[in-house]
């Protein structure tokens, strides 16, 4: 596994954000603790990296109780970069729209966001090629208290967890 600093933007884009098969890269964290969704929501609202639609502001008090298959879009400079799927209180489900990750700066902001989020939930967060596949491949791991890691070898989600 290589740390993120080893690759230049061209290599990162080619490895993580290629769009010849799909425009979406899936994000998942398993085994969320009780109250984690509220913590994640508050983290999103407090970060200066992303903004959310006004209709989702003030949701913190009821987010754990009202899992309703809602989708919250996170915007970076008015571009819909990340979608958060409120399907479960037990795992984090998000995706990144790879079409809008067009610079190293945006990639680094995404890494900062997910590194901070992994510290908050005290669990690994995985960036996957396609969660729908039978054996999705892990492209990147965000670990609490460490730098993100790009996975250059083949690593399935089952192997990583």
Show the residue positions of the predicted features.
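Short, extreme N-terminal segment that most often corresponds to the first beta-strand
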Residues: 1-53
